[in-house]
Each structure stands twice: as C-alpha cells, then as structure tokens.
Amino acid sequence: MFRLLLTLTIWAGHSLTCLSASLTIALTGDIMMGTTYPTPRLPRGDGKYLFRDTRDILRQADLAVGNLEGTLCDKGETRKEGKANNYAFRTPTSYAWWLKDAGYDFVSMANNHSFDFGIEGVISTEHALRQQGIAFAGIAGRSETAVVMRQGVRIGLCALGHNSYTVSHLDLKKVGKLLKQLRQQCDIIIVSFHGGAEGTAQSHVPNGMEGFLGERRGALRQLAHYCIDHGADVVYGHGPHVVRGIEVYKGRFIAYSLGNFCTPFGISLQGVSGYAPIVTVTIDHKGRFQKGRIYSFIQSYGAGPRKQDGKRFLVAHQMKALSETDFPHSDAWIDLRGNIGLIRYTRRSLTTI
C-alpha cells in the first residue's frame, strides 16, 4: 500500500542570495492578529500597524515562518463550548494581506485553534493564505507538508501538533516516515511543532512528556532530537505562550518555544507572556547552523510586537538564561546582545565563532 504525501508547493516572491553559501530563516511564535468572535477585537488601522517594527527583519530573511494561532474566516459559529472567556479566534480573511506584507512565507496550522470554526474555517484559512502566496502545513490529510522553492533549491516544511486533526508529533513513527519522504524531495527541511504545557511557569523544557488540561502535549526534547536524527535541519516550537531555550544539536538549530509574537487580543501579555522575539538562523547549504540572532520585541494590548526603550535585549537575556540552564551541553552560545554562535571543539581547546 502506498501512502500519499500531501504537499503544497509555493514559488516564493523574494530571491535567495548566495544560496550555495547560506540561507537565513526568520522564526517567530504565535500570530493571532485580532478576532471578530464573539465580539470584534481588532487592532488600530485594521491591522496596518501590527508589524511596523518587525517588517524589515522578516522581509530581509530568505524565509520567514510563524504559527497562525486561529482561523482566517469572516463568518461561522465555533464548535467550542460556550463560555464567558471563550478562546475561539476568527480573524478576518483580509488580514492575510498583513501576513504577506509583514514578510511571511510560511505559517503552521498545526495548533489547537485551527479548527475553532470547524472544517469551514480551515478551508477559508487555506484559501486566504493561497491568495497571498503564503505556504502552510499541519492539517492531517489536507496539508501535511509544504515545499518552498528558492532559485532551484527545494525547502521542505512540515508542521506537527498534538490535536487529532493535526499531523501528530505524538506518533514518532509517523513523523519519521513524513521526514523520510520529505528528505527524498527536498534539500533543506524545517520542522514546526506545537506542544508543551502553557503558562508563565512553563518556561523550562522538562525531560519527558508534558501535559496540559488533560492532554498529552509531547516529549519535546525527544521530539526535536528525533526530527534532527531523521533529516530535519531546523526545528522550532510554539504552544506554551512563553519563550523557552534554544540549542544546537548535531550541528542543527532547535528553538523550543518562541512564545507569543503578534497576539494583541485574547491572550495574556503580562510579563514574560508579552515577550515576542524574532530569531534569525543562518545555515549552510547542507542545513548546518552557522550563526543566529535573537531580536527582542515586547507586546502590549492591541499593538503587536514593539521595540521598547531600555528593553532592547530583554528577551534575548531571558532566552540566554533559559538556554544555559536547560541545555548546558548545547553547541551554541548566546551573548548579551542576542547574537548566537557556534562552539567549536578541538583536542586541546574550546573556541567560539
């Protein structure tokens, strides 16, 4: 029996500079630009200013990726239980343009809000993204992978989640098969995962399985290493709504959670929940990590990610501390300005580059 690998191919708009030498990828966390459900909570200028401070960084990358937390649809009722604080997100389809304008090339749909408005919401979201030329993946049986072309180089992306309608990272055997098939098609592979417990107390990456609200949310260290061992070159996560540490494992880059990036409504932005980094990662033509940088932005209610005076490196400091605590044997170092480098080991010495 042959298994069908569902793949969406997008020919992206901006060029890849010196691909034979390197590729720079901009990674971000959760995106929920506003919602019309149950009552409208939309940003000033109908979304025009959401990405004003981050647009240049995202556009300058060869590839910009993030997690679309919710749906892009203009009507419909949620299947979720009616509660006063109902986390069901319905962003107008017109806001897909702001994703494109911000510089995004790919978004994950493998999260616990993609089905907030049922299959109709999924179809509407897919259509809105296609209209803007933005690739997507993460829904089992519909959009399991995407391939983005850059000057003849095929970059494969897959998005994993823990919900029944996603490509589940709880089934490592299935993940391995997906990566094997993607590796046969592509030169570089990027994996996005949605997992981990949620909340301000969940900044550290534990060993073993994480749970939240009775759900199994993944053994994320094991998952990330498994993906690298089976062909992935870059792995990035989201789901806890706070940032977590990074590591370089076998020469490949892993970010365990990039937190809330552009979530001006409906999600707490207090304290560390408002930390909104962009992490840029430069890899060589074989996918090996070369260098990176953590750009520190802070969110405030209704505004999106912003630079803040006196806090230029605040998020980088947090991610540096978490990385050094949780991944002391990583091959990466982070300085106080957010630069990420690679530790080189020799027989007689240890050097950083």
Each PLM stretch: what is its role?
Residues M1-I10, H14:
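Sec-dependent signal peptide recognition
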Residues L19-I353:
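Acidic, metal/ion-coordinating pockets
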